[in-house]
């Protein structure tokens, strides 16, 4: 069973390696608001495919990948203590107060606010880096993917 699972994995990795361009050492991609507004790179890896590919690369290299755990921590840290108190803490933060819920329904007319950039403090002149910037909005190399392994 392990051989039958390993063979398609190796074929997929070989195809990926042949597709990936070699990047110069030390090259860091930076994403600005303009980069994000232009959309994903034609050869970028985006969405749910990104953690899957990084996980596969890390497995092939014999390293671990904690991407899922990091995302889980971010989600749990977003639970507001006021929401826990409003619901008595009985649902573990899944329910929120009416005021908090209605705040998400306000109509926004500014496209920067609608995209979430203004709330996160992303400025037009300041860039940010990360796996989404490097591999979705830009084209990342195999070496850059390996850097996200443990």
Swiss-Prot record:
Pfam families: Insulin. GO terms for cellular component: extracellular region. GO terms for molecular function: hormone activity; toxin activity. GO terms for biological process: glucose metabolic process. Residues 1-25 form the signal peptide. This venom insulin facilitates prey capture by rapidly inducing hypoglycemic shock. Intraperitoneal injection of this peptide into zebrafish lowers blood glucose with the same potency than human insulin. In vivo, when applied to water, this peptide reduces overall locomotor activity of zebrafish larvae, observed as a significant decrease in the percentage of time spent swimming and movement frequency. PANTHER family: INSULIN-LIKE PEPTIDE 1-RELATED, INSULIN-LIKE PEPTIDE 2-RELATED. This is Con-Ins Im1. It comes from Conus imperialis (Imperial cone).
